[in-house]
């Protein structure tokens, strides 16, 4: 089961109802041990539901991300960019064919029209104005606090909340 899981009760429900595993993304991305830049973690932690936007990714999949300056500009131009889509392998600025299908390289107009590699790398480096910060819509288990992986696992599996910091 993937998506929308952020509490012990939700994880327990699915595991007790036959799921072999659950996928928890954002809560692990913002742990102390996570190797992303501090700004990356803060953007995800500080985003409230109104700060999120849903759109189609460059791979053609539904996406949800924090409305950063880059994403706001992109969404304003998205229809124009999609209307000008044309298949041209040279449009892949990284020349790495990181996706099987890519809206910008393959000219698929209904897909996103940006380089996902560049945008995710900027986010990982903490470049808030340039990065794409994917985020789940669920409330984070520890609110605005950044906790360890051990504390997160203890909470998700056992319901043990860490002591106040």
Describe the residue ranges of each PLM region.
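Conserved active-site-proximal phosphate/metal-binding subdomains
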Residues: 6-165
């Amino acid at each position: 089961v993937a998506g929308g899981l952020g509490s012990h009760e939700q994880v327990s429900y699915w595991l007790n109802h036959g799921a072999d595993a659950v996928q928890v993304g954002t809560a692990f991305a913002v742990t102390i041990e996570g190797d992303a830049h501090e700004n990356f973690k803060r953007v995800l932690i500080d985003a409230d539901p109104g700060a999120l936007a849903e759109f189609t990714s460059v791979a053609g999949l539904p996406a949800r991300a924090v409305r950063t300056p880059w994403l706001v500009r992109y969404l304003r131009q998205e229809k124009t960019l999609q209307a000008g889509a044309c298949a041209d392998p040279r449009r892949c600025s990284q020349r790495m064919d990181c996706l099987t299908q890519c809206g910008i390289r393959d000219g698929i107009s209904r897909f996103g029209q940006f380089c996902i590699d560049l945008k995710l790398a900027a986010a990982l480096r903490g470049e808030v104005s340039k990065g794409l910060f994917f985020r789940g819509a669920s409330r984070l288990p520890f609110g605005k606090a950044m906790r360890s992986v051990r504390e997160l696992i203890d909470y998700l599996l056992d319901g043990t909340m860490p002591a106040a910091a």
